[in-house]
Amino acid sequence: ALRVPLHYRDFSPNFMELSTEGFELLDSLVAWGNRYNVYLILDMHAAPGAQNTSDFSDSEFNGDSELFTSYTNQRWLASTWKHIANYYKSEPVIAGYDLLNEPARPGVATTLRNIYEQCIDSIRTVDQNHMVIIEGNWYGNDHTGLFPPFDPNIVYSFHHYVGGINDTTTMYNQYRNGIALQYNVPLWVGEFGENSNTWGYGIKEFFNRNNIGWSWWNFKSVERISSLFSYKITDEYQKLINYWGGT
């Protein structure tokens, strides 16, 4: 499966305002997935108000994760997911919905669960078939407060890079034994990679042995050997980079 990052503004530029712009972009990828039999997992990489303070979540101006402090932003996220799910409810190449990429804020275990429940409740009003995927707090890895499972078609996800859990015994006990076997739910690693080839191969084999699904991150990059695909920077692309950088 290919994990596809989404920005909420492509589907809902303002609160309670829906847009089809994002579907115009996604539909070409859906056609590609159908053509080559590649499942797609839709991933909310940037949520209203931002789910962490990193640049990839589009944290605005003050660098805060205001998804957790604004009920309006939480409703906005849930309504956006309902909009997306309603559009793709009958699309078989869509494997599931990754509700929130790498949430990160201290002391929000209860709030994070409430956000997920709002999103799932909204999705299930229009789509009872697709999987819903939830990530733990602290960039996907702390699932405190997210048990027991609260949907019959739920997947628990975590991310793994060098610098995280380094021994496979601890990882097995925390994820395979502590989540999948205890609660009878599937596991999926939504991100791993961008380290050495040897490390990547070894951890992939660990996932495969333990029936843990995975998706390499990221699938395509610019002039890097750590991605599955890489492309060269063209003169036109460099001009764009220079413009963004103010040169």
Task: Briefly describe each language-model feature range.
Residues 1-2, 12-96, 115-124:
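An active-site-proximal structural segment forming one wall of the substrate-binding cleft
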Residues 5-8, 44-52, 136-138, 218-223:
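Short, solvent-exposed turn/loop segments enriched in Gly/Ser/Thr/Pro and often Arg
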Residues 8-12, 102-105:
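A short, flexible beta-alpha/helix-coil linker loop
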Residues 72-222, 226-243:
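Extracellular glycoside hydrolase catalytic/binding regions
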Residues 245-247:
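Intrinsic low-complexity, glycine/proline- and repeat-rich
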